Structures are given as structure tokens and as C-alpha cells.
């Protein structure tokens, strides 16, 4: 964080008012491997702290997501991709980068980008929340159908069925 603040000061001294995106990547280094573990909660906590600092300064923030320590696209990769993307999005990160990085950022693959893109779609749906409106509640349709019939034949159901339930593209 100190390096980012120093960069901000130098940047603004050179060009007052110039755009600046706040953020820094990092966590405690794993001294066994001499690598920074992308998948660790420590990395995510750092991203959360940077997002909070950026918000207090009124600046946009970047962070990482869709990253893993795993060398393969396996269960660990899926869990770490999902955790990191969801945490970054919920923190309000404006620019999420490194999507698709494997093996603590040492490798990447097109397959991991596809998985990352799919999980980004999932996170966007989750962050958007529920659409609660007169149209989506459809109380008039509920009253019209009544307790003993079904909703499958209703135009409202047909209009909303495919866009309400998230569907994966690649998985």
C-alpha cells in the first residue's frame, strides 16, 4: 500500500488531476516455494484492504481474480478461481486482472480463460442480485392462475423462463 501511495503522490506531482487506478498485488510470500500464493486468503485480504483504501481516497481500484496456485485445471483451480472472482467483485474492484493464471501466475491457458469467463458470468449474475419488480413478481398472474393450476402455459412464464435462470455456456 505504501508503494501505491508513493506512486500516487509522484503521479499527481507530475500531472495534477491525471487519472490514477489504485491497487497492489501481494500477500506474504510462501517461504517454502518463494512464491506469492494467489489462492491464499492472505492475497484476498490484501485485495480487500486495497479496495477499501481506494474507496476512502475516491479512486478506482484494481485487483486480481480468476487465479489459482494449482498447476492444472482441477478442483483447486475451480475453487480458487471462483473465490477470488467473487471476493474481488464484492469488494467493488473496478479492474479485475490476471484471470486464467495458473501455478501462482507462472502459466496460463486458453482453457483456464474459458473457465474464468464462465465464472465471471456467474459472478455478474450473483452481484446483480434479484430483480424484484411488479413484472417479475407477477402477482396478477399468481392471482389469475390460482392455487390448483400450473404456470407453464402462462405467457409471463415463457417470457421470463430463459433469462431468469442462469445457464452456463461452456460447462
Predicted segments, located by residue:
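Catalytic-core signal marking the mid-to-C-terminal active-site face
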Residues: 111-171
Amino acid at each position: 500500500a505504501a508503494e501505491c501511495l508513493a506512486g500516487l503522490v509522484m503521479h499527481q506531482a507530475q500531472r495534477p488531476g491525471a487519472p490514477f487506478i489504485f491497487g497492489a498485488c501481494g500477500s506474504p510470500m510462501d517461504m517454502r516455494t518463494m512464491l506469492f500464493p494467489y489462492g491464499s486468503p492472505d492475497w484476498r485480504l490484501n485485495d480487500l484492504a486495497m479496495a477499501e483504501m481506494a474507496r476512502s481516497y475516491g479512486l478506482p481500484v484494481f485487483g486480481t481474480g480468476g487465479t489459482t496456485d494449482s498447476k492444472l485445471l482441477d478442483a483447486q483451480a475451480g475453487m480458487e478461481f471462483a473465490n477470488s472472482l467473487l471476493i474481488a467483485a464484492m469488494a467493488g474492484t473496478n479492474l479485475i486482472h490476471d484471470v486464467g493464471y495458473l501455478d501462482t501466475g507462472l502459466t496460463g491457458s486458453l482453457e483456464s480463460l474459458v473457465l474464468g469467463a464462465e465464472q465471471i458470468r456467474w459472478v455478474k449474475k450473483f452481484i446483480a442480485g434479484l430483480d424484484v419488480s411488479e413484472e417479475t413478481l407477477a402477482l396478477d398472474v399468481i392471482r389469475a392462475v390460482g392455487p390448483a393450476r400450473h404456470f407453464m402455459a402462462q405467457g409471463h412464464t415463457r417470457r421470463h423462463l430463459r433469462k431468469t435462470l442462469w445457464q452456463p455456456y461452456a460447462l
